[in-house]
């Protein structure tokens, strides 16, 4: 997540790898990711690269990972909290069957509309229901309605880190038993292992404690199985088991 004060801090979109070697990361992208990247996703990635907050996007290797994951679990009904220009949303829409659905929520429709023409051109807009505004009130209403309990196959969260635990408290009721929740940025620029006096960017330092709190809570949650992966900026997969 970026703020105006962080504009221009990195001009290469999606460069969020935790690999120690930039050359190794480029090797992965150029050998296994970019050659297999669908044209609509490539187009959106290149457009997003021009956005001043481009580091907010899902990286290309993580998009590829999400696509494979969704197909492996035969996901059909999904949710995404935090959309930005829609790169991960597009990856999801392309991976779902034609009658698949995505409830997508973001506080900024303007960014979503950057990617919307590409989504429409790809013939995927019918899979997406976009809701502008904070996600928590929507989730609370869904839980109150009762009919959405256990109805989601996959939920991807890449939004305000200070609300991740609040999201989890609600999403655990909305994802089905055997379904997955994916929390993005759970290694948070590698800051989760940084010493207290490490020189961190202001926004990294601000959200660091929230990410640490989330990781600790997920590890202790007996309702889920977890797997934390160093893909992109770190993603934790939570499989609901009860």
Curated annotation (Swiss-Prot):
Pfam family, one: Methyltransf_3
UniProt cofactor note: Binds 1 Mg(2+) ion per subunit.
Top-level EC class as recorded in UniProt: transferase
Residues that, per the record, bind a divalent metal cation: 158, 184-185
Keywords: Lignin biosynthesis, Magnesium, Metal-binding, Methyltransferase, S-adenosyl-L-methionine, Transferase
Catalytically driven reaction(s): (E)-caffeoyl-CoA + S-adenosyl-L-methionine = (E)-feruloyl-CoA + S-adenosyl-L-homocysteine + H(+)
Tissue: Mostly expressed in the bottom and middle parts of the stems.
InterPro entries: Cation-dep_OMT, SAM-dependent_MTases_sf, SAM_O-MeTrfase
Induction line: By wounding and viral infection.
UniProt protein name: Caffeoyl-CoA O-methyltransferase 2
Provenance organism: Nicotiana tabacum
């Amino acid at each position: 997540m970026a703020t105006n004060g962080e504009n221009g801090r990195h001009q290469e979109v999606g460069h969020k790898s935790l690999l120690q070697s930039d050359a190794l990361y480029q090797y992965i992208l150029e050998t296994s990711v970019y050659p297999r990247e669908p044209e609509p996703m490539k187009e959106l990635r290149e457009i997003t690269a021009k956005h001043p907050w481009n580091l907010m996007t899902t990286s290309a290797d993580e998009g590829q990972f999400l696509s494979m994951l969704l197909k492996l679990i035969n996901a059909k009904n999904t949710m995404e909290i935090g959309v930005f220009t829609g790169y991960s949303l597009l990856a999801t829409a392309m991976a779902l069957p034609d009658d698949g659905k995505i409830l997508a929520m973001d506080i900024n429709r303007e960014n979503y509309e950057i990617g919307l023409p590409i989504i429409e051109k790809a013939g995927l807009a019918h899979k997406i229901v976009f809701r502008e505004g904070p996600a928590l009130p929507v989730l609370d209403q869904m839980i109150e309605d009762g009919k959405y309990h256990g109805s989601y196959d996959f939920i991807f969260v890449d939004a305000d880190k200070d609300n991740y635990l609040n999201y989890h408290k609600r999403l655990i009721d909305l994802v089905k038993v055997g379904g997955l929740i994916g929390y993005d940025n759970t290694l948070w620029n590698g800051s989760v292992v940084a010493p207290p006096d490490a020189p961190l960017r202001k926004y990294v330092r601000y959200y660091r404690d929230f990410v640490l709190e989330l990781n600790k809570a997920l590890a202790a949650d007996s309702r889920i199985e977890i797997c934390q992966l160093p893909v992109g900026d770190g993603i934790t997969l939570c499989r609901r088991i009860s």
